[in-house]
Amino acid sequence: MQAVPSENLAIDRKKRAKEPFLELDLRPAEERVCDFHEVVIGFTPEQAKIEAARCIHCPDPAPCMLGCPTHNDIPSAMWLIEQGKFSEAAKIYHKTSSLPEVCGRVCPHEQLCEGACVLNKNGEPVITGQLEVFALEQERAKEPYVPKIAPSTGKKVAIVGAGPAGLGCGDELLKLGHEVTFYDSKPAPGGLLVYGIPNFKISKDVFFERWNDMVKLGAKFVGNTYIGRDKSIDDILTEGFDAMFVG
């Protein structure tokens, strides 16, 4: 369900549908061949508002929401960005995604939300992925997101694998008040985000900023531990854990 009901917006949808989309600014090729920094420069606040204003706000549920695996309330986020309410837009993504700053960069948007955008019929879709990144970066620059945490339950959960699946599960468990410990064979958390996807797609700093948020909520990490070889599942369960998630 949309936080900002589309039917309540007095907008000229025909005019919006004809607005040209903004080409993403990329770092010059002569710079990119010398390093592995992110390729996309991203939107300025003014560019973000212009691009978000291309959204025609389809009836709920909008095609972009249905095309998103986490069903992000994209139309509401677009409206808030258009109004310059960037932090409020970021909070929309936090409601349905544990790693929105990551998904905004690495999701195949052209096959998901952007691929489902009705503007594809006569032109280019709203560039929802980079607008998600923009909103999250604006929020972090001003006031990092701090979720509401339930009172401690006294329950302990072991997460095997500190990749995207484990991190998403752990994030939800932490917010529910459980104690969470991640186990991973690598020396640092992140899984594919750190050891698979190159920096020019997503900077490692992006992930570790998000990881630090989880540490502040109480997340613990045990690295260089291969579950099934260095330590068995039974070993973990005998250490006082009430449940286990295998990512």
Task: Name the predicted role of every residue range.
Residues M1-K156, K204, L237, F241, ...:
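Ferredoxin-type iron-sulfur electron-transfer modules and their immediate structural context
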Residues S98, G163-P164, A188:
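Residue-level detector of alpha-helix initiation sites
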Residues V126, G196-G223:
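N-terminal glycine-rich dinucleotide-binding loop that anchors FAD/FMN and/or NAD(P) in oxidoreductases
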Residues K155-T181:
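N-terminal Rossmann-like FAD-binding beta1-loop-alpha1 element of flavoenzymes
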Residues H178-V194:
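Glycine-rich FAD pyrophosphate-binding loop
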Residues V222-E239:
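A conserved short coil-to-beta-strand element within the FAD-binding core of flavoproteins
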